[in-house]
Design a protein with these regions (language model features):
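Short hydrophobic core segments
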Residues: 13-15, 120, 136-146, 180-181, ...
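FAD-site-proximal beta/loop scaffold in flavoenzymes
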Residues: 158-175, 261-337, 440
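Flexible, glycine-rich terminal cap/loop adjacent to redox cofactors
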Residues: 15-41, 47, 54, 58-65, ...
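FAD-binding beta-loop-beta segment adjacent to the flavin cofactor pocket
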Residues: 149, 286, 292-306, 365, ...
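N-terminal Rossmann-fold NAD(P) dinucleotide-binding loop
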Residues: 21, 187-188
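Glycine-rich Rossmann-fold phosphate-binding loop(s) that bind the pyrophosphate
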Residues: 16-19, 42, 181-184, 312
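Gly/Ala-rich phosphate-binding loop of Rossmann-like dinucleotide-binding domains
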Residues: 25, 29, 191-196
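Glycine-rich flavin
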Residues: 2-10, 26-33, 39-174, 202, ...
Length: 466
């Protein structure tokens, strides 16, 4: 129910029209709050639709089709001299993104809340100054301004020139060779995309492994495939400087105690993103910011309780479904201060859309050890599984983590074919707090990829208490 009265223009002002902001506005409007959404970007849709999840996955799927066609002889199918039209690949991606963005624009302008195209800055804790010259007031705020590409660690890159995760998704032509700086999800996805479109790729990662937050057995599987597909990996390597050379660009690296120089036509800087909050005036009104991110509690409140922050601007988890959940929690709490909800990250999930796909939910072995959480783990390889052998998808494995005393499933990992789909069985199991005994007893159709989960479940069921 609206509580503005004569004091404020709106019950809730949402700054940012991406996934988190739209979720907050939709939830608030459904709860009867007078709501306004402010979007100051040149385009409407948010990172996921415009320059993140959707365009990258459209391109990655095209790369997968090209890879399968190029290896059709594995199934006895002749497909000689497989070629591609990169302009058509990009045109298909652009058409999809236009449709997705148009739909989001329609949702934002659908009349359930006010939608304004303007940048916003806090003049005081309850007032926003807009780039249009107007001002508006609100009882509560949700900041959902997303993230921007992080500044490069090598100052020379500004002069040399480089691609970012934003610009790499909109190239008119492919470079012949590419140096990828970074080893996180975006870096490895784009590295494999370009490599499968026959670009010579060198990937440079500071940590000992790509996807360094995950378990070493997980990242090792992906690195094995990358090397097999011709991607040159430099792990445990520090970039030192960059310069232009006659035939392209060169990066100096510190690798195994020596200086190594690698050259390519282009450099892709993919060392992450940072919260997009610099222009909001948060420090002036006392909103706590640490390490360039907005600090929130589990109710998504900032240090000023009537101001909430969700999504990438909090710097916690750059994952769309988390931003959506946070937006819904923030809006609910703005509407119902007497029965507030809080975020539960127990089912935190991440999927990396390489091939094999990498998907994790809950605890990894690394995070369980860091938290001193007792666990038992069991895994099973796709190289010994009937359906994956039929598909020639032999790389990777599934792994379960369980509480030793109760057998409750506390984590799952899938490195393998359609891992992003397969992990949802474990998400559902953990949502209902199932044990490995219950998962092992659940029927699985044969032959399917999903039945592979039964094997580690059965192994753990024999070891865990009930």
């Amino acid at each position: 129910m609206s509580t503005t009265g004569a004091k404020f223009d709106y019950d809730l002002a949402v700054i940012g029209g991406g996934s988190g902001g739209y979720a907050a506005a939709r939830t608030a409007a459904a709860d009867g709050l007078k709501t306004v959404v402010l979007e100051g970007g040149e385009e409407v849709g948010g990172l996921c639709i415009l320059r993140g999840c959707m365009p990258s996955k459209a391109l990655l799927y095209a790369a997968e089709v090209l890879h399968l066609a190029s290896h059709a002889d594995l199934w006895g199918i002749r497909a000689d001299n497989v070629t591609f039209d990169f302009a058509q690949v990009m045109a298909r991606k652009n058409a999809l993104i236009k449709d997705f963005a148009d739909y989001r624009r329609q949702q934002l302008a659908g009349g359930k809340f006010k939608f304004l195209r303007a940048l916003a800055r806090f003049a005081d804790p309850h007032t926003l100054e807009l780039s249009t010259g107007d001002k508006l007031t609100a009882a509560n705020f949700v900041i959902a301004t997303g993230s921007v590409v992080a500044p490069p660690p090598l100052p020379q890159l500004e002069d040399v020139g480089y691609l970012t995760s934003d610009t790499a998704l909109s190239l008119a032509r492919l470079p012949k060779s590419l140096i990828v700086l970074g080893g996180g999800p975006v870096a490895v996805e784009l590295a494999q995309f370009f490599a499968r479109f026959r670009v010579r790729v060198t990937l440079v990662q500071r940590s000992a492994h790509v996807l360094s937050k995950l378990d070493d057995d997980t990242t090792g599987e992906l690195e094995k495939v990358f090397r097999r597909e011709g991607i040159h990996l430099y792990t445990g390597t520090k970039p030192l400087d960059a310069r232009r050379v006659e035939d392209g660009k060169e990066v100096a690296l510190e690798h195994n105690g020596q200086t190594v120089r690698v050259r390519a036509e282009e450099i892709l800087f993919a060392l992450g993103r940072v919260p997009n909050i610099a222009s909001l005036g948060l420090e002036d009104i006392g909103v706590q910011v640490e390490d360039r991110r907005i600090v929130t509690n589990d109710q998504m409140q900032t240090s000023l309780p009537h101001i909430y922050a969700v999504g990438d601007c909090t710097g916690l988890n750059e994952i769309v479904h988390i931003a959506i959940q946070q937006g819904e929690v923030a809006a609910h709490n703005a509407a119902h201060s007497d029965r507030m909800k809080q975020m539960d990250y127990r089912l935190l999930t991440e999927v990396v859309f390489t091939e094999p796909q990498v998907a994790v939910v809950g605890l990894t072995e690394k995070s369980a050890r860091a938290a001193s959480r007792p666990y038992l783990a069991a895994s099973y390889p796709f190289s010994d599984h009937g359906k994956s052998l039929i598909m020639e998808a032999k790389d990777g494995f599934v792994k379960l983590l369980a509480d030793p005393a109760s057998g409750e499933i506390i984590g799952g990992c899938c490195v393998g074919p359609v891992g992003g789909e397969l992990i949802h069985e474990i998400i559902a199991a953990m949502h209902k707090r199932m044990t490995v005994h219950e998962l092992a007893a659940m029927p699985h159709y044969h032959p399917t990829l999903a039945e592979i989960w039964a094997y580690p479940a059965e192994e753990l069921a024999d070891k865990c208490g009930r």
